[in-house]
Regions:
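Bacterial Sec-dependent N-terminal signal peptides
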Residues: 1-35
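Extracytoplasmic loops and strand-loop junctions of Gram-negative outer membrane beta-barrel proteins
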Residues: 35, 69-73, 169-174, 218-221, ...
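Outer membrane beta-barrel
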Residues: 37-64, 76-209, 230-246, 320, ...
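Outer-membrane beta-barrel domain signature
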Residues: 40, 75-78, 116-119, 175-179, ...
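Detector for outer-membrane/organellar transmembrane beta-barrel domains
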Residues: 44, 243-398, 406, 443-447, ...
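Outer-membrane beta-barrel translocator domains and adjoining extracellular loop/strand segments
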Residues: 63-70, 111-123, 155-161, 211-218, ...
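Predominantly the C-terminal beta-signal and adjacent terminal strand-loop region
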Residues: 222-226, 417-456
């Protein structure tokens, strides 16, 4: 086993070295890019159409959960290469008060990816919406279509190209790939900015769980998403902006402005859907339960020195997540494994192999992150600067019987050209859980190390 780990580490080091040579060469070309791919539609530059390309490539070493198998072979650890996100965004102000937005792409493509046995990527439209401005400014916009616009949290509708941490706190995308399409829903919304208030109200038509592409979860004594009733979902998000107003072009919310804006917000959000969940009572009668999600949060992006262009970034959020009795869901981002032979895992909560952990559940969650942006060109004019960060997620879920799902991340972004060209290094420590005589107990902690290269234009 030790020899295997040594060989794997040697392969990882050599792989990282080769990739960095390519990254540095390509990043120099990106750093020379000054203009957006933006096309003006009139002489007065009042209307436009813009295209953005983005790719996030991961190199990852993961310490596997107990019993993990890859292609039928037990693996105590894995090293994989994958495309976390590959996206094309197309949007524009096509008339003085008319806006349209499309996003096309794919996610989580690695060597164990399979679409019904087919490794070929299945890209799809993430967003397709039309929006009309009823005011002269941003006071009121009405939109509809397939959209990320929703309630709960800024991280429920994140701009993935501006993330500070390696990835977003996915638990905030509370129904992802259950009754939505990768966190997007068919919705009608109103959003706007009135004085210092940024608001959005959303009515969504959730997808039925039967269209997930696989078999639906069987009903049990623990709550799961209902395969029968499908009521409309109501969402609200309200944010009070103490300093500068945040960008309002699309419904997405920025991860970090890298000190280019002075932002301090306090916000609250909610999602409600009647009878979204179901379970059995005494293994016989069916009981429907409401989906109730609530969050209060604060976001800070504060420049410190105009000449140095250094800044601090911070976020803190408190979530109350009620999916019904004992709801729990494991999830692992771009899971490097595809099976398990473990016998003592929590059942009925999704795949517990690879890098997964209890990410969603009925209970309460505290999430916080903090980062510091060093001065501009810290490493030299052509090598950019650094942005170290740390984040913590503490989930107290009902089904874990008092055990805490605590996840810690520390990392650093090497900003070669802001968000357009950056290399991120991230270390994660996550919990594992076992089931003994129907009692949930904590297993050993597992770790993961990721290098990501993000390029966008």
């Amino acid at each position: 086993m030790q020899e295997k780990v040594y060989i794997m580490r040697s392969v990882i080091i050599k792989s990282f070295s080769l990739v960095f040579l390519g990254i540095l060469t390509f990043s120099n070309q990106l750093m020379a890019q000054k203009n957006d791919l933006k096309f003006w539609l009139d002489e007065n530059k009042g209307t436009y159409f813009q295209v953005i390309f983005l790719n996030q490539t991961w190199l990852r070493f993961n310490e596997s959960n107990s019993g993990t198998k890859v292609n039928g072979v037990p693996e105590s650890s894995t090293f994989d290469i994958g495309l976390r996100r590959t996206r094309i965004q197309m949007f524009g102000q096509i008339a003085p008060k008319a806006f349209m937005y499309f996003q096309f792409g794919e996610n989580n493509f690695n060597a164990v990816y399979s679409n019904n046995g087919n490794r070929k990527i299945a890209p799809f439209f993430h967003d397709a919406l039309c929006e009309y401005k009823l005011s002269n400014g941003n006071q009121l916009k009405i939109g509809g279509g397939l959209t990320i616009a929703n309630g709960l949290s800024r991280f429920s509708q994140p701009s993935i190209g501006t993330i500070m941490t390696m990835d977003v706190p996915v638990f905030a995308q509370a129904t992802v790939e259950k009754i939505d399409q990768f966190a997007r829903k068919l919705s009608l919304y109103a959003r706007g900015q009135v004085s210092k208030l940024d608001y959005r109200f959303v009515v969504s038509d959730p997808f039925p769980v039967s269209t997930l592409g696989g078999s639906a979860e069987p009903i049990s004594d623990n709550s799961s998403f209902s395969a029968q009733k499908r009521n409309k979902q109501f969402q609200t998000y309200l944010s009070w902006q103490f300093f500068e107003k945040e960008g309002h072009t699309t419904p997405y919310m920025t991860g970090t402005y890298l000190g280019k804006k002075k932002v301090l917000n306090v916000a609250a959000g909610m999602i409600f859907q009647k009878d979204a969940m179901w379970r059995t009572v005494n293994s016989a009668d069916t009981l429907f339960e409401n989906l109730n999600l609530f969050c209060v949060e604060s976001f800070l992006d504060l420049p410190l020195n105009k000449e140095k262009k250094n800044a601090i970034m911070a976020y803190a959020g408190y979530f109350i997540t009620d999916y019904g009795k004992n709801y729990l869901r494991y999830n692992g981002l771009m899971n490097p494994a595809d099976g398990s032979n473990a016998q003592n895992v929590i059942t009925g909560a999704g795949p517990a192999y690879g890098n997964s952990y209890p990410m969603f559940g009925t209970g309460k969650v505290i999430y916080s992150q903090f980062g510091y942006l060093f001065r501009n060109n810290l490493l030299g004019e052509d090598l950019g600067t650094l942005q170290p960060y740390a984040s913590v997620t503490v989930g107290n879920y009902e089904r874990l019987q008092g055990n805490i799902s605590d996840v810690y991340n520390v990392g650093v972004n090497w900003l070669l050209n802001g968000h357009n060209a950056k290399i991120s290094f991230d270390f994660q420590s996550r919990p594992s859980f076992l089931l003994e005589n129907n009692d949930v107990i904590k297993g050993g902690r597992k770790s993961c190390f990721i290098v990501q290269f993000q390029a966008s234009i």
